[in-house]
């Protein structure tokens, strides 16, 4: 990490300011050359003109110097706050490269922070998740994770496992020295407790992932019951074509919208019915796939039409699902001839007039999800918790069978999985993969 890296840290586009970030051994040297200054006071904002090597002015900017190790990366960092737009920051970046800086790779600033002990990979993932969060609630949950509770918990579990492994491997090396029965009991209890904690983390994260990622809602029903009208009403704008002709929607339509603090992704599906039309058949297949992927289902029926076999097929399709279903009787402002033979608790509404009741029911359901507790958004970390929990559980069984070598193997597996997200992990190839999806300049 002897080279000095540079990147634009703000999003591309027109704005009031743009920030160019510089990190490495020569960061201060380059900043002094650009500004014609002889020194910079750490952590002080300095207003200055910036010049290229032909002594032509680039911009007037604010420059802040963070002296190592008291910086984001643990190296010398200089941040330039220039005027915004597409050009100025690009010109400054080109000038830094001509002085000897290298363009940073995606996530390289965060990677250097991890390698220099300024943060754990878990903290870096939380920062990236916060940047990409799509709702106020998601940002709140991720910000809470950043305060260290999850990182401290994983580090404690990893430390417990390492200490236990040391005892067991010593016993393996000195076969004549059996582990005392009281110590075996303590180890067994430790395994049971830590396996349970990790299982709770990944099961909670899976069951409540909609709080962070957004809940997926699929609208389903036979053709021409008002599914597209309902989609438009929820979005508050005309997104889908509304027609009296059955089968108008042949593909799924997906859009995001917010209800309170919750992000929702709503999917309007093609009407489900028997059809000889090949394109419509494909649409129906996509509709059924959307139901599998959805967290919530809005099952729509037409109050102005007598219940028929196509309605029955919708009931049958949803009979064995464990997903939350809102049963909706649309067009309830018209003469109601639909017979509720299934005794469903229908929400009666008119999608073209008022869906307030549906919004209230949805809001109440979403608010019933407790946002407290440790929730993980990273699929990689969820899988690591699952693998570790299962390995520790297996290790406990092997301990009871006195299979210490296999016990040590399982414990090592759990330790290595958790270590990828804690302060002791330093393997460059895994960090490269982890930070490859980060923003440039982060």
From Swiss-Prot:
One GO biological process term: tRNA methylation
GO molecular function, a single term: GTP binding
PROSITE patterns: G_TRME (PS51709)
Location(s), subcellular: Cytoplasm
Keyword Signal: no
Top-rank taxon: Bacteria
Binding positions for Mg(2+) per the UniProt entry: 228, 249
Positions bound to GTP: 224-229, 243-249, 268-271
Cofactor(s) the protein needs: K(+)
The protein's Enzyme Commission number: 3.6.-.-
Name of the top EC class for this enzyme: hydrolase
Pfam family, one: MnmE_helical
Keyword Nucleotide-binding: yes
Residues at which (6S)-5-formyl-5,6,7,8-tetrahydrofolate binds: 21, 79, 118, 442
SUPFAM superfamilies named among the record's database cross-references: Folate-binding domain, P-loop containing nucleoside triphosphate hydrolases
Keyword line: Cytoplasm, GTP-binding, Hydrolase, Magnesium, Metal-binding, Nucleotide-binding, Potassium, tRNA processing
GO cellular component terms given for this protein: cytosol
InterPro entries from the UniProt entry: G_TrmE, GTP-bd, GTP-bd_TrmE_N, GTPase_MnmE, MnmE_dom2, MnmE_helical, P-loop_NTPase, Small_GTP-bd
TrmE-type G domain residues: 214-367
Ligand binding (K(+)): 224, 243, 245, 248
NCBIfam families in alphabetical order: mnmE_trmE_thdF, small_GTP
Family annotation (PANTHER family): TRNA MODIFICATION GTPASE GTPBP3, TRNA MODIFICATION GTPASE GTPBP3, MITOCHONDRIAL
Function, as annotated: Exhibits a very high intrinsic GTPase hydrolysis rate. Involved in the addition of a carboxymethylaminomethyl (cmnm) group at the wobble position (U34) of certain tRNAs, forming tRNA-cmnm(5)s(2)U34.
Entry similarity comment: Belongs to the TRAFAC class TrmE-Era-EngA-EngB-Septin-like GTPase superfamily. TrmE GTPase family.
Subunit structure as annotated in this protein's UniProt entry: Homodimer. Heterotetramer of two MnmE and two MnmG subunits.
Protein name: tRNA modification GTPase MnmE
